[in-house]
């Protein structure tokens, strides 16, 4: 995917405007008499070999362009300052261009809890290369058929996806 396409994705996300908010679908029911003490509530989650204080992280956003690098650096700074996990966007562009620095956030944020992701269409050896290059806590494998179908340059061959997922799960 070209740098222009990555920037186009950013532009679409920024231009998207909607009055819909999924939080509007949540109805909080007032309970005057609580059944538990606040100290009894524990949001700790065990995931990826770690205990997380609460299940909140910055999920895969972008990568693969100069603008994406700026966004990733800002998100990484916030995540590091707050002790939250940051997941980079799909490393596909980084695999194509060894000079792409948009994913290289650890050098400026050494205490960052980092993960990255890769598309299921990528061979598992490319996933291993991604891990070797970025040293994330884990590799997230994304499956996004609709995105592939909507992008003119998107993947059109899906017969390997199931085997790839099985290999990623064993690796």
Predicted regions and their residues:
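A gly/proline- and charged-residue-enriched helix-loop-helix capping module
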Residues: 82-119
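Active-site beta-loop-alpha junctions enriched in small/polar residues
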Residues: 61-63, 91-93, 117-121, 144-146
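A generic local structural motif
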Residues: 43-45, 101-103, 126-127, 162-163
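Short N-terminal helix-initiation segments at or just after the protein's N-terminus
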Residues: 1-5, 21-27, 52-61, 79-82, ...
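Active-site cofactor/substrate anionic-group-binding motifs, chiefly glycine-
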Residues: 47-93
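Short secondary-structure boundary/capping elements
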Residues: 39, 67-71, 94-98, 156-160
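Alpha/beta enzyme core
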Residues: 76-81, 108-109, 113-114, 121-171
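An N-cap/entry alpha-helix motif that binds or orients negatively charged groups
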Residues: 1-48, 52
